[in-house]
Amino acid sequence: MARVTVEDCIDKVDNRFELVLLAGHRARMISSGSPITVDRDNDKNPVVALREIADETVSPEDLKEDLIHSLQKYTEVDEPEPESVPLIASSEGGVDDADIVLDRMTEEELLAGLQGLVPPEQTDDDEG
C-alpha cells in the first residue's frame, strides 16, 4: 500500500494551500456520506481524498466550486411588498409633520418621574 503525498497531487493542483483546502473539503464530503471513487484500502478520509485527486477521479475544479458554494452565505433581504409601497409614500389624508405637537419635559419633571420608579426585584443572577 503506497501512501499518497502532496508531491503526487501537486501536478493536478498547482497551489499546495489550495490542494489542502480541496482535500479537506473532499474528506468532509466523504465523512458525510459521499461515495468514494477509489478503493479505500483501510485509509482514512484525507488520504482517500488525496488519492482521488491524484488519480483524477474527482475534478479539482468541481471540488473548488463546491467548496466556494459551501462557504457562501445567502441572506434573504426583506423588501416591502409592491402594493404597500405607494401607501407609505403617499401622505394624503395623513397628518402633516408641522401639526404634530410633542410634550416637553423639564429636567426637574424627569428627575421626579425617575424617583417615583420602583426598582426591579432582585433575582438570583444579581447575587454573586
UniProtKB/Swiss-Prot annotation:
One of its GO terms (biological process) is DNA-templated transcription. It comes from the Bacteria. Its EC number is 2.7.7.6. Keywords: DNA-directed RNA polymerase, Nucleotidyltransferase, Transcription, Transferase. One of its GO terms (molecular function) is DNA binding. InterPro entries: DNA-dir_RNA_pol_omega, Pol_omega/Rpo6/RPB6, RPB6/omega-like_sf. GO terms for cellular component: DNA-directed RNA polymerase complex. It catalyses: RNA(n) + a ribonucleoside 5'-triphosphate = RNA(n+1) + diphosphate. Belongs to the RNA polymerase subunit omega family. Promotes RNA polymerase assembly. Latches the N- and C-terminal regions of the beta' subunit thereby facilitating its interaction with the beta and alpha subunits. PANTHER family: DNA-DIRECTED RNA POLYMERASE SUBUNIT OMEGA. The RNAP catalytic core consists of 2 alpha, 1 beta, 1 beta' and 1 omega subunit. When a sigma factor is associated with the core the holoenzyme is formed, which can initiate transcription. This is DNA-directed RNA polymerase subunit omega. It comes from Azorhizobium caulinodans (strain ATCC 43989 / DSM 5975 / JCM 20966 / LMG 6465 / NBRC 14845 / NCIMB 13405 / ORS 571).
